[in-house]
Design a protein with these regions (language model features):
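Flavin-dependent oxidoreductase catalytic cores
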Residues: 1-201
Length: 201
């Protein structure tokens, strides 16, 4: 989902983890999901994965990166909830962990789940973005939840050039994050970010 990233009609605010500003309209605030709506979204994600499996998909990838909806729940900057889905690191990860559990329930433990996530937003200290230390905690939590592989990314819309390679980025500009994740977990790690050399891959 897009959450605060949706290019929305200013009279119809999008939903997000919290009452946070939308990306394109700074004076428009998102509507926070209720707990019942979160539960509905978890069920919908599991059902969508099941439909993918029935259609012949070999695996699914959860889109937990870049400042999109799931990342909004995971990130303190955009998640200021005070219930079980906000506050602590574990609470901010709850939505994601419930989605993974629901996909496994609907598709079986043998159906591979790949998670694409930001090991770091790489935005410096402060501001509520997550850093590499928190990203490694996320990676270990994903592995413990039974995820088959991790697709590591860096950045978010607030610094989109770090997430989407431009002609100004150095080759392999995200490899530092993928390398750190690879050393922290035993499951396969997928890297991206202007990789041209086999030795870098």
């Amino acid at each position: 989902g897009l959450g605060r990233m949706g290019y929305t009609d200013p009279t119809r605010p999008p939903y997000s983890a919290s009452d946070t500003e939308t990306f394109y309209f700074k004076d428009v605030r998102c509507k926070p999901f209720t707990v019942d709506q979160i539960h509905y979204m978890v069920k919908a994600m599991g059902n969508s994965a099941m439909l993918c499996k029935r259609a012949g998909a070999d695996a699914i990838e959860l889109h937990c990166y870049g400042g999109y909806l799931i990342d909004q729940f995971q990130t303190a900057r955009w998640n200021t909830r005070t219930d079980e889905y906000g506050g602590s690191f574990e609470n901010r990860m709850r939505f994601t962990m419930e989605i993974i559990a629901e996909v496994k329930k609907m598709c079986g433990d043998d159906f591979p789940i790949i998670v694409k996530f930001c090991a770091t937003h790489d935005m410096g200290e402060g501001g509520g973005y997550h850093d590499l230390e928190e990203g490694l905690k996320m990676a270990k939590m994903y592995e413990a939840a039974g995820v088959a592989a991790l697709h590591v990314d860096v950045g978010c819309y607030d610094a989109w050039y770090k997430a989407i390679t431009t002609c100004y980025n150095k080759e392999g500009h995200q490899l530092f994050a993928a390398k750190a994740v690879k050393e922290a977990v035993s499951i396969p790690v997928i890297a991206n970010g202007d990789i041209w050399k086999p030795e870098d891959a």
